Swiss-Prot record:
A biological-process GO annotation: tRNA methylation
Free-text comment on the cofactor: Binds 1 [4Fe-4S] cluster. The cluster is coordinated with 3 cysteines and an exchangeable S-adenosyl-L-methionine.
Record's protein name: Probable dual-specificity RNA methyltransferase RlmN
Active-site residue list: E108 (proton acceptor), C358 (s-methylcysteine intermediate)
GO cellular component assignments: cytoplasm
Residue positions binding [4Fe-4S] cluster: C128, C132, C135
Keyword Nucleotide-binding: no
Lineage: Bacteria, Bacillati, Actinomycetota, Actinomycetes, Mycobacteriales
Other observations noted: Reaction proceeds by a ping-pong mechanism involving intermediate methylation of a conserved cysteine residue.
Protein's organism: Mycolicibacterium vanbaalenii (strain DSM 7251 / JCM 13017 / BCRC 16820 / KCTC 9966 / NRRL B-24157 / PYR-1)
Any one Gene Ontology molecular-function term assigned to this protein's record: tRNA (adenine(37)-C2)-methyltransferase activity
Length: 365
């Protein structure tokens, strides 16, 4: 097993990007417009352009007087990042973008097109401080938090690409890219509010179509429940026992399995939403029949019908000694979890060959 890395909850103190329109809530937008000496109605106009028409360049905002476009661009729409590399697979249905921020920081997002939906997997941090040994992102360490605008710009870029490509619409947003979302709590919550707010205050994506993942920061899970955002909570559990989870998911040394599941139950009770349990199945590590039985027993006892297990065949990462469990073992694991009365399916893995699947994002390049 790889030498453990330290847990990092607080991002290194690095300068954040300049203020961007997407960092601002409704009152902040009004204040920013007033600072520029513009009429109050311009704030709503700019929001309609950004969130409704997906335009982030004021020089293209035709309902804005030409004389003020450059001033608005300089004050509210600085360049945050650009695409450093783009790669596709699945016949063009999966597309990974490596973004490079103005300070050189890199992070990734993945756009996945399905017959019935379009999903973008976005990053909340550049890197990750949770140090999970089977995850390429966790092994790379934490560089810095992303700003609210950097998070939202990933969503806007994906939405604009779908629209421009074939008139498609973004339907789902999952915070399953780089980083631990609940370790960048305030910015992630602000981003979720604007993702789900109706136009002109946000992108208008249903809260039920937004998923926030976590390795199990129990107090933050409870805090998120009290926000009443009603997004889907995805808990990366990966094993039901503390002995193994202390190593597989090092944050377990801070909050044990039972405490994390208790927080998940609180989330389900407050929101009425089913909690998703993410479980990367690793050959001869966490795929034993007794672990399937214990997982089903614990989840059924804590969450009853308000839980679903997503089994994820382990995706390969450079230098890893681990690989996915054989299909017969996977099928038996599913059967045993279901036998305990818990819904369980194997996730459709996209992007494995371009290192765009779960646990593979490393922002290299």
């Amino acid at each position: 097993m790889p030498n453990p890395l330290p847990l990092v909850f607080d991002a290194p103190r690095r300068a954040m990007p300049p203020r961007h329109f997407a960092d601002l809530d409704e009152s902040g937008r009004a204040a920013a417009v007033a600072e520029l000496g513009l009429p109050a109605f311009r704030a709503k106009q700019l929001a309609n352009q950004y969130y409704g028409r997906l335009i982030a360049d004021p020089t293209q905002m035709t309902d804005l007087p030409a004389a003020v476009r450059e001033r608005v661009a300089d004050a509210l729409f600085p360049t945050l990042f650009g695409a450093a590399r783009e790669i596709e697979c699945d016949s063009g249905e999966t597309r990974k973008v490596l973004w490079r921020a103005v300070d050189g920081t890199t992070f990734e997002s993945v756009l996945m097109r399905y017959p019935d939906r379009n999903t973008v997997c976005i990053s909340s941090q550049a890197g990750c401080g949770m140090a999970c040994p089977f995850c390429a992102t966790g092994q790379g360490g934490l560089k810095r938090n992303l700003s609210t605008a950097e998070i939202l710009e990933q969503v806007r870029a994906a939405s604009a690409e779908l629209r421009d490509r074939d008139g498609g619409r973004l339907s789902n947003v999952v915070f399953m890219g780089m980083g631990e979302p609940l370790a960048n709590y305030n910015r992630v919550v602000a981003a979720v509010r604007r993702i789900t707010a109706s136009s002109p205050n946000g992108f208008g994506i249903s809260a039920r179509s937004v998923t926030v993942s976590t390795v199990g920061l129990a107090p933050a899970i409870r805090k998120l429940a009290d926000e009443k955002l009603n997004v889907t909570l995805a808990l990366s559990l990966h094993t039901p026992d503390d002995e193994l989870r202390d190593t597989l998911v090092p944050v377990n040394n801070r909050w044990k399995v039972d405490e994390v599941l208790d927080a998940a139950r609180y989330y389900a009770d407050v929101t009425g939403r089913r909690v998703s349990i993410e479980y990367a199945l690793i050959r001869d590590v966490n795929d034993q029949p007794w672990r399937a039985d214990l997982l089903g027993k614990k989840l059924h006892g804590e969450l009853g019908p308000l839980v679903h297990v997503n089994l994820i065949p382990l995706n390969p990462t450079p230098g890893s000694e681990w690989d996915a469990s054989p299909k017969p073992v996977e099928r038996e694991f599913v059967r045993r979890v279901r036998a305990k009365g818990v819904s369980c399916t194997v996730r459709d893995t996209r992007g494995r060959e371009i290192a765009a699947a779960c646990g593979q994002l490393a922002a290299e390049g």
